Amino acid sequence: MDFWTAFQAIILGVVEGLTEFLPISSTGHQIIVADLIGFGGERAMAFNIIIQLAAILAVVWEFRRKILDVVFGLKSQPAARRFTANLLLAFMPAVVLGVLFADLIHEYLFNPITVATALVIGGVIMLWAERRTHSVAVDHVDDMRWSHALKIGFVQCLAMIPGTSRSGSTIIGGLLFGLSRKAATEFSFFLAMPTMVGAAVYSGYKYRDLFQPSDLPVFAIGFVTSFIFAMIAVRGLLKFIANHSYAAFAWYRIAFGLLILATWQFGWVDWSTAHG
């Protein structure tokens, strides 16, 4: 492994860790950054699975007490059973639609132009959602109804379009459906666990032949980097939302998306030939 390859692994690990749980689209950033630094091909597909697992492991570690409380409370606590049922219900739409359409979406939509467009549209929707007046019916994730979970699960499917953002769609969906900002954010984190693990297992099995022993050092660097920065992002976001709205992320999405579209429109970067 040469220095440049190690540097690429660090950069992409940082990008994955920082963006996976922020409402700015980790997939979109990965596609754009990977294209800029020339990290692609079969190794990149396997590498992305590894760094996504690292990011979700950071969330599991951060919420380990809540997870253990739910696991040990399944037999005796109705709240734990309801929370688990809500997670499974919210997870199912992504399973069905992911299996049916994942290959088509990857083939036709995994490119920087789609990402940039989705970033802008998602940013505008995020601003609208934050500025509208909405009542809070659910203050805590344990108080969610099955209907809340199912609706958030369907909204999560929008994130199959790169640039939309899984966390962004579920958080904003939660706000629109009556969840508090804290409840919507926490449920988004918890929903990420089965969703991302399921996607990683599916992709890992599908592309199992791409994992080569010679790539272990690159994978290790990306894994550790992604884990560390995902932990920073999760803790930072939970503190941020206590006193702030998501407007800053919305403006970032719009500005970043417009920048990508401008570089393409004026011919500074030929994004149209790029593919994730």
Swiss-Prot record:
GO cellular component term of the entry, any: plasma membrane
Pfam family, one: BacA
Reactions mediated catalytically: di-trans,octa-cis-undecaprenyl diphosphate + H2O = di-trans,octa-cis-undecaprenyl phosphate + phosphate + H(+)
EC numbers, comma separated: 3.6.1.27
Residue stretches spanning the membrane: 43-63, 85-105, 109-129, 183-203, 214-234, 249-269
Keyword Secreted: no
Membrane topology: Multi-pass membrane protein
Keyword line: Antibiotic resistance, Cell inner membrane, Cell membrane, Cell shape, Cell wall biogenesis/degradation, Hydrolase, Membrane, Peptidoglycan synthesis, Transmembrane, Transmembrane helix
Aminoacyl-tRNA synthetase is among the record's keywords: no
InterPro entries: UppP
Primary site of residence: membrane
GO molecular function, one term: undecaprenyl-diphosphatase activity
Single GO BP term: cell wall organization
Compartments where located: Cell inner membrane
NCBIfam families, A to Z: PRK00281.1-2, PRK00281.1-4, undec_PP_bacA
Entry's family note: Belongs to the UppP family.
Additional note from the record: Bacitracin is thought to be involved in the inhibition of peptidoglycan synthesis by sequestering undecaprenyl diphosphate, thereby reducing the pool of lipid carrier available.
Protein function: Catalyzes the dephosphorylation of undecaprenyl diphosphate (UPP). Confers resistance to bacitracin.
Name of protein: Undecaprenyl-diphosphatase
Gene name as annotated: uppP
